[in-house]
Regions:
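N-terminal regions of ATP-driven nucleic-acid and macromolecular assemblies
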Residues: 1-282
Length: 282
């Protein structure tokens, strides 16, 4: 939902699972990553791939874990557009780039998914440009043509790439509204429902929306002794150091029948060794 809430770390896990060989529990595929936030860390991704590869016995002929990791990394295609317009152009060029065997090593692999981290990167600049265009259009002397909506173009480009490559799109975004705090009167999110912050048509673009956040640590009670507060603080610090996160379905705009099928979530830990998944929970 916000920077540091585990979204990119969860993407590392998904990417590692996608590019590892099937003999090690992976999908032996390729991934395209549009890193508009510039937050992707190759050493961290490498660490996650090594961690997953090391959890399964190395089959004969697979080579060492380091060799397997290096081979898997060659199938992660990281692109870093610097503006909304360049992101649109990059998304439009994906089919041409990936279907040319001379461009990369993944021609014989299918694309597991296209990732965009994050769709919110250019939100404020887009909003400022939109407001400026509206202001200019409202002046009598302005004869400029309205500019195409960048977010509409990006949504269309990603959908076209998804269809052409037979690959789903995974995108992250930030929650730009108020943050839930049950201790503050006047605002509280109901259940697991968060209204999407991105402009149209992005509210209706995803088939499934997930909320990822650090597992909340309850606040200290008001009536508590100093000794109890010290012990409680130590326990709270241990919980924070675990790097525990939770992921659950965003119920905004989802009908009840679909919710009954999807009402579950999972927890994961972000550690120095990488992301460790917990079992699914109801």
């Amino acid at each position: 939902m916000a920077p540091g809430d585990g979204k990119t770390s969860l993407l590392y896990h998904l990417i590692a699972t996608a590019v590892l060989p099937s003999a090690l529990g992976g999908r032996q595929a390729a991934v395209v990553m549009l890193d508009t936030d510039g937050r992707l860390s190759v050493p961290r991704l490498r660490q996650q791939i090594q961690s997953l590869a090391g959890r399964s016995p190395q089959p004969d002929g697979c080579g060492s874990i380091d060799e397997t990791t290096l081979s898997a990394l060659k199938h992660v295609h990281v692109l870093r557009p610097q503006s909304l317009a360049s992101t649109v152009a990059t998304a439009r060029s994906l089919e041409k780039y990936l279907l040319n065997a001379d461009n990369h090593n993944s021609f014989e692999r299918h694309i597991a998914f296209i990732a965009l981290d994050s769709a919110s990167s250019f939100y404020w600049q887009h909003r400022a440009d939109t407001e400026e265009s509206a202001l200019m259009a409202g002046t009598a002397s302005s004869k400029s043509m309205p500019q195409p909506n960048g977010y509409v173009q990006l949504a269309a480009a990603l959908k076209n790439a998804s269809r052409a490559l037979h690959a789903p799109v995974i995108f992250t975004s930030w929650h730009l509204g108020p943050v839930r705090d049950p201790n503050v009167n006047g605002f509280a999110l109901e259940g697991h429902s968060v209204r999407p912050s991105l402009p149209p048509p992005w509210q209706d673009l995803p088939t499934l929306r997930l909320i990822v956040q650090r597992t909340p640590v309850r606040k200290l009670p008001v009536e508590i002794s100093l000794e109890e507060a010290r012990q409680e603080s130590e326990q709270r610090q241990r919980v924070v150091e675990q790097g525990r996160f939770e992921c659950f379905v965003n119920e905004w705009g989802v009908d009840e029948r679909t919710l009954q099928a999807l009402r579950s979530g999972f927890e994961f830990y972000v550690t120095q060794e990488g992301v460790r998944m917990e079992n699914s929970k109801d």
